[in-house]
A protein has these predicted regions:
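Conserved cytosolic headpiece of P-type ATPases
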Residues: 1-502, 509-510, 523, 534-537, ...
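Hydrophobic, aromatic-rich cap/lid helix
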Residues: 277, 559, 565
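Generic alpha-helical transmembrane segments
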Residues: 480, 525-526, 548-562
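Helical transmembrane-bundle signal
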Residues: 522-525, 529, 558-561, 590-594
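Membrane-helix interface and helix-disruption motif detector
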Residues: 539-545
Length: 650
């Protein structure tokens, strides 16, 4: 009866991989740490595993695909184009009309456009060292190192402040000497913003926003210093210029104004009517240098990138094509089209669409739902409060760490510390590496446990004494198996991981023949161990020595086998051992600890072992080495069969 109880306990201990939960937790924790070092902060742990399944990344254009460093490049006023020089937020630059430098202070129409952009604004231009006294900057000559200029607020508005500063508008008057009487803030639905100021001639409203929206609200247009009626022909001309500027990748805003009587409560509703159009302003937001490469990397990994932006369709298409995100055959859809589309029609179009322009948060939600209906695993970026529903609906919601709101970050599974699209691709890459590593140590631990179970089961079936006692099995599962398994979680990314298609989300961990590998390789380890036990028992007739030989043979077979688990896609000879020094260290420590369990007198009493002699080690090395060689043979046979099967299918 005692022998039967021991057999049952030993089989139970052998069947349960005690170290597996701890190793899974360590793998996920290390993965989160690695992602954090690459600026991807994981807020919800399941996202780590889901990242490896992502098939579509829906990314905002501004700040994620581009630098979010707006610079005014062009004005269109009174039928003329005015170029603006300068880079970034430094308030130095010139104004050129037909290639000739002009002083904006002498151009009343241009100055009004600059003034509207400058004062219809909440952003602040600052330096990262002591601020200098504000003064006209048009003629300022730079001496010495250029100061670092920064924008506090929205970069689009910041670009308009910089343009005004280039023309000599005094920075110190903003927000102090000339405070607005009232503000009608920007809203994604309205696509415009208005600020009302009190000037010497009374109240004046300055308005900026999407050209198609502002033009529809204008009844007049400023031409050659006179206000003319806004005719249908003028509307078409302005919108044509808007399309031209947008097709060059510029973000275009329309600038307008109107004089107001004294305001009463309900008068605010009519402020943004009967406006006078002053002109258009085009701003450049250069793409991030690393994004083009990251988009190509994602494409090679079977991950499609979709641009979602509030900008004009032509602006979005220009940027998308410059990044290699959209080709000639790809669809681009604007928000107005989305409004008129049924869900079924959107379902048809979304598969071939790479760009969505002039979208609002409700559109984002519909796009995510349509992509998910096609079976895609969707990652969606967002920064505003209204983006939270779309982020929650996505499989991986991604918030912006620099520009995002607290509400969006709370709803997201991941936060980008640098607001960079390349970080999303890096996180997908890490997600695949983590999943690969989880499969590696599951393969290792379960094959080792299968070998232990088979050893015990065969001995019981054929009537042999128990080859292993429970304490020996626990020692292997928790110590000599556990350390190499943890080291496998630190394996670097397979260079070919991003050339494979995303795995199916419902794909089990034992897919792609992993279960068969575990079973076959567990059989090999088990046969080696039981053979070592039988040979030692037959030669010496000492049960304790035979158990020690079987115990040590099993440990050595497992320590050899761990190197076979480093890759499912490469042979052992193709993997560089030096890329995971932790594994080498773990194997060395596990081997040393096994020697202590065999030779240390105190440990011998605990683990029921005896000191082994040279002949015992010959048996151990021959059989554990044979198991390693046989694993290689089995793997080669499996690859050959797989290759021939694929050729036959073709």
């Amino acid at each position: 009866p005692i022998e039967m109880i021991m057999s049952g306990v030993s089989l139970a201990v052998a069947a349960i991989p005690e170290g597996l939960p701890a190793v899974v937790t360590i793998a996920l924790a290390l993965g989160v740490q690695r992602m954090g070092r690459r600026n991807a902060i994981i807020r919800k742990l399941p996202a780590v595993e889901t990242l490896g399944c992502v098939t579509v990344i829906c990314a905002d254009k501004t700040g994620t695909l581009t630098r979010n460093e707006m610079t005014v490049k062009e004005f269109f006023i009174g039928g003329k184009r005015v170029e603006v020089t300068g880079v970034g937020y430094a308030p130095y630059g010139e104004f050129l009309m037909s290639g000739q430098r002009v002083d904006p202070r002498c151009e009343e129409h241009l100055m009004l456009a600059l003034k509207i952009g400058f004062y219809c604004n909440n952003s602040v231009l600052t330096q990262n060292r002591k601020k200098e006294t504000a003064q006209p900057l048009l003629s300022r000559q730079k001496t010495g190192p250029a100061p670092k200029w920064e924008i506090l607020g929205d970069p689009t508005e910041g670009a308009l402040v910089v343009a005004g500063a280039k023309a000599g508008l005094p920075l110190h008057t903003r927000g102090t000497h000339n405070s607005p009487v009232h503000e009608i803030p920007f809203d994604p639905e309205r696509k415009r913003m208005t600020m009302i100021y009190r000037e010497s001639k009374g109240l004046v409203a300055y308005t900026k926003g999407a050209p198609e929206v502002i033009v529809s609200l204008c009844t007049g247009i400023l031409e050659s210093g006179r206000v003319l009626e806004m005719s249908p022909g003028e509307r078409r001309r302005i919108l044509s210029e808007n399309s031209r500027m947008a097709s060059q990748g510029l973000r275009v805003l329309a600038l307008a104004y109107r004089h107001l009587p004294e305001l009463r409560g309900k008068d605010l509703e009519n402020v943004e009517t009967n406006l006078i159009l002053v002109g258009l302003v085009g701003m450049e937001d250069p793409p991030r240098e690393e994004v083009r490469k990251s988009i190509a990397l994602a494409k090679g990994a079977g991950v499609r990138t979709v641009m979602i932006t509030g900008d004009h369709l032509d602006t979005a298409l220009s940027v998308a094509r410059s990044l290699g995100l959209a080709g000639e055959g790809d669809l681009a859809i604007c928000g107005a089209e989305l409004d008129s589309m049924t869900d079924d029609r959107l379902l048809e179009c979304v598969e071939n669409s790479r760009v969505f322009a002039r979208v609002n948060p409700e559109h984002k939600l519909r796009i995510v739902k349509a992509l998910k209906a096609h079976g895609h695993i969707v990652a969606m970026t967002g920064d505003g409060v209204n983006d939270a529903p779309a982020i929650k609906e996505a499989d991986i919601g991604i918030a912006m760490g620099l520009s995002g709101t607290d509400v969006t970050r709370e709803a997201a599974a991941m936060v980008l510390a640098d607001d960079n699209y390349a970080t999303i691709v890096a996180a997908v890459e890490e997600g695949r590496a983590i999943y690969d590593n989880i499969r590696k140590f599951i393969r290792y631990l379960l094959a080792c446990n299968a070998g232990e179970v088979l050893t015990m089961l065969v001995a019981v079936i054929i009537g042999l004494p128990l080859p292993l006692v429970p304490i020996q099995i626990l020692w292997m599962n928790l110590v000599t198996d556990g350390l190499p398994a943890i080291a496998l979680t630190m394996d670097p990314l397979d260079p070919q991981a991003m050339s494979r298609k995303p795995r199916r989300p419902r794909e089990g961990v034992f897919s792609e023949g992993l279960g068969l590998k575990i079973a076959s390789q567990g059989v090999i380890i088990g046969i080696s161990t039981i053979c070592a036990f039988i040979i030692s028992l037959a030669l010496c007739g000492e049960i304790k020595r035979a158990r020690t030989v079987a115990f040590t043979c099993l440990v050595m077979a497992q320590l050899i086998y761990v190197f076979h688990c480093r890759s499912e896609y490469h042979r052992l000879s193709e993997t560089d051992l030096r890329t995971n020094i932790y594994l080498i260290g773990a194997v060395a420590i596990s081997g040393a600890m096994q020697l202590l369990a065999v030779y240390l007198p105190v440990a011998q009493g605990v683990f029921h072992t005896v000191a082994l002699d040279g002949f015992d080690w010959i048996i151990i090395f021959l059989l554990s080495g044979w198991s390693g060689i046989f694993v290689v043979i089995i793997e080669k046979a499996r690859r050959l069969i797989k290759r021939r099967t694929s050729v036959i299918r073709v």
